[in-house]
Curated annotation (Swiss-Prot):
Subcellular location: Cytoplasm; Cytoplasm, Cytoskeleton, Cilium axoneme
Species annotation: Homo sapiens
Keyword field contains Nucleotide-binding: no
Key words of the record: Cell projection, Ciliopathy, Cytoplasm, Cytoskeleton, Disease variant, Kartagener syndrome, Primary ciliary dyskinesia
One cellular component term from this protein's GO annotations in UniProt: cytoskeleton
Principal cellular location given in the protein's record: cytoplasm
Subunit and partners: Interacts with DNAAF2.
Name by which UniProt lists this protein: Cilia- and flagella-associated protein 300
Amino acid sequence: MATGELGDLGGYYFRFLPQKTFQSLSSKEITSRLRQWSMLGRIKAQAFGFDQTFQSYRKDDFVMAFFKDPNVIPNLKLLSDSSGQWIILGTEVKKIEAINVPCTQLSMSFFHRLYDEDIVRDSGHIVKCLDSFCDPFLISDELRRVLLVEDSEKYEIFSQPDREEFLFCLFKHLCLGGALCQYEDVISPYLETTKLIYKDLVSVRKNPQTKKIQITSSVFKVSAYDSAGMCYPSAKNHEQTFSYFIVDPIRRHLHVLYHCYGVGDMS
């Protein structure tokens, strides 16, 4: 049987946790930023609990069981491609894909190289460049150039493993935004928002032996397919349409971070 197809799902059961709030997406300041970036009303975090020990090598069984669970089906939200309204999936998932996303970064010093390489000035202002397109994104500054243009001079300041890190993915998604994104002139709103969302989603603990802080969460980028093709996070594939599953194996919590590319709420 192909990876991620329905088989022995190992007895995972889930429960929706509507009482869990994500301040990083709902505070007044962040809401204002998401509106400017054309992501407001199109990004959502939800929390679920589960009842079995999570084992990362069984991630496909875990994710498939999630989509089949009667407590998930009426509660997992996604945006309708046709109406733009929040809906539930409403179709039977036949196959899933869960890609491991490394999550090891404990500090925003990861982004100091943006200053070191003159992509951001000491003042925090992002260095401008001549306009170009990397479809569908307008590139008008050095930040978007280093994020998107593989043959650009400074692309390699972030290695491929760096770019796969959840912290980098989150930062890049916020920088690129939605369909009518108004870009920031300074770097701080992107860094601050990335940090707040990351801290809200990712779990850490102090190692009892070494006394060092370590990340306990596992992160996966998830897609689901019905008999017609991809149905989640959307039937339409886009770099800015995503769903990340952040699994805390100790608390047995699953955080789902979802965004669907489009025109965000203006009001």
